[in-house]
Amino acid sequence: MKLEADEVTKRYGDFQALAGACFATGSEARVVALLGPSGGGKSTLLRVLGGLLLPEAGEVRIDGEALPHEPAAALAVLRRNGFVFQGYNLFPHLSLQENITLPLCEVHGQNASAAAARALELLERLGLAEHRHKRPAELSGGQQQRGAIARALAPRPRLLLLDEPTSALDPVMTGEVLDVVRELAEGGQQIVLATHEIHFARHVADWVVFLAGGRVLESRPAADFFREPACDAARDYLGGLSRYR
């Protein structure tokens, strides 16, 4: 996939989260990692790329197709994508399987039997079939996040967008989730990932977009970025993260 952003601006009140962000990935990029310090704009850019937020200015293109700013058209784009956040966002009163089937039926218009079959397929794929009747509170953090990934994959999304999916997990649970994401990437799923997990990004990403202060400072193949970052901010960021690892 080829992702492009031209002078994208997004504000939250007086705070400018994206300040004319510009970048383009290579068309060969399959997994794009958004990296940078906290507050740099990663999560906001991820939401704009997925159609979850509309920018005040600028344009985003995916494989040459400009994302619309008109709300109804933007909603159609949003429904083509899948999102996973650090807080899981599973419905606490529903079983794991129901968390997957409900959006398939209510949002995507599938019938109950097709939705149940798709849910079971994904739960088996992600090692969760035996837990399908449990509610989120009965699952570990890693299981809940894998369930959230299954729900995001259920409608066969064009893009899977992951926003800090492991930041609330311990190392064992993090490993569970990262294994799943790696398998998805190897299977051809197009992924945009905002993360501080540099070790994982180094091994799974094809392309890195580095942000700080709401601006994109680097957009390069991942191997080039990790071998020799071009800007001081990226060098300082990578050096700070690796100092105690």
Label the predicted regions.
Residues 67-82, 112-113, 225-229:
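ABC ATPase NBD coupling module
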Residues 160-163:
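Catalytic Walker B motif of ABC-type/P-loop ATPase nucleotide-binding domains
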Residues 35-37:
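The feature captures the beta-strand-to-loop junction immediately N-terminal to the Walker
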Residues 154-158:
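A short, proline-enriched helix->beta-strand linker immediately N-terminal to the Walker B motif
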Residues 135-139, 143:
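Conserved ABC ATPase signature
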Residues 50:
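Helix-to-loop junction immediately C-terminal to a conserved catalytic motif
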